[in-house]
Amino acid sequence: MKLSFLIISLLLVINVNAQKIDKVINAAEVERIEKTLSSDDMQGRKTFSAGIDKAGDFIASEFAKSKLAYLDGAKNYFQEITMVKAKAVNITGTLDAEPLNSNNIAANTTAEEININSLTDYEVVVVKAEDDFSKTVFPLFDIKKNLLILVDTAHARRFKGMQRFTSNAKFSAEVSQVFVLTSNLKPASIKLRIKNQLTEQKLKNVVGLLPGKSKKEEYVVFSGHYDHLGIGKPNAAGDSIYNGANDDAAGTTAVIMLANYFSKMKNNERTLVFVAFTAEESGGFGSQYFSKKVDADKTVAMFNIEMIGTESKWGTNSAYITGYEKSDFGKILQQNLAGTSFHFEPDPYPKQNLFYRSDNATLAALGVPAHTISTSKMDSEKLYHTQEDEIETLDMNNMSEIIKSIAISSASIISGKDTPTRVEKLK
């Protein structure tokens, strides 16, 4: 008789909690937020645009509805980031007898002027024809030295992309990487002068806090990025706006809804941090900046949410976790979902290196169990980075179930009962 009473009581508690979460996290609310963020009015939410500012204001207004607190010392929900754009106004020089100009030079720099008068001024790196361009070049940006990078003309197409990449705004830096497209990989001399026009540009993350109770100094982060690709050339249907409904208005929608849910539950012993990152699409600058301002050692977990608008390869009621094997984060989440129909799986696309391709990467590199939750079929995502990534292609009911499952699965982490094992730091 007592056992029957306990079972009935437990079922009643589960039912009451289910009703509570359904009132806050449901398909109608998902659609309201998603529809706003991915609307044409947001102009594709490109960095440094009126559209992304409008999106940021909307996210901040939603955080205000949930009565989230500001970051310590902040006067609003915006975490402002100063970037520097260097536009070359004059490039002159020679590599041996070969003229150097805007056609064969790309400089990743925030210096007003660059002068290279010999091959000993900068450390020389050679990218040969047979080298993998990405694997050879991108690690160079982490080296705190001035580099002169000679790129074989076999990589001419990738070099053009590098010119576009280096022209973007970036964090101010004391070192520069200068790329030269040339067939002369063993030069005897160089003379190069680059004169730049520098312009400051502002970005902003949107950040709100739900202070904890007994473990207030420990942080759990819920994040997604709210930027996308903006406006481009019209497609065959005449659509020029990259709405980014799935990438990543979907993740940002989840962050807003989780903030609202937890603010109503008031059951977090740890402090919860809700972040909508900027500039993920253009280099992850928002999450990089955030990781420098938060104490990684006190950050016990990060739920980064990216592209959850479509069904996963396993169908509805499922999602995958990147870097599943790097901590016991995923196992904890699945344990908290016992008795439900939802299941988390390890990332099925290891060749895509997704763990280090989203906003979780910078905190993960510092040892935080920071993982991305997604449903995107990355080996066959036809609408990825296209104008067709519209709200009509998303499943609101499934999104709602995913967001509920993130809320439920995080319970023992936000309560302080469980602490995921740390990720190995990148050296």
Where would I find each of the regions flagged by the language model?
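N-terminal hydrophobic or amphipathic helices/low-complexity stretches enriched
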Residues: 16-55, 59-70, 210-212, 217-219, ...
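Second-shell loop/turn segments in exported
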Residues: 20-24, 40-50, 77-80, 122-129, ...
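Noncatalytic luminal/extracellular "stalk/propeptide" segments of secretory-pathway proteins
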Residues: 43-146
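Soluble metallo-hydrolase cores and metallopeptidase-like ectodomains found primarily
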Residues: 161-244, 257-260, 264, 269
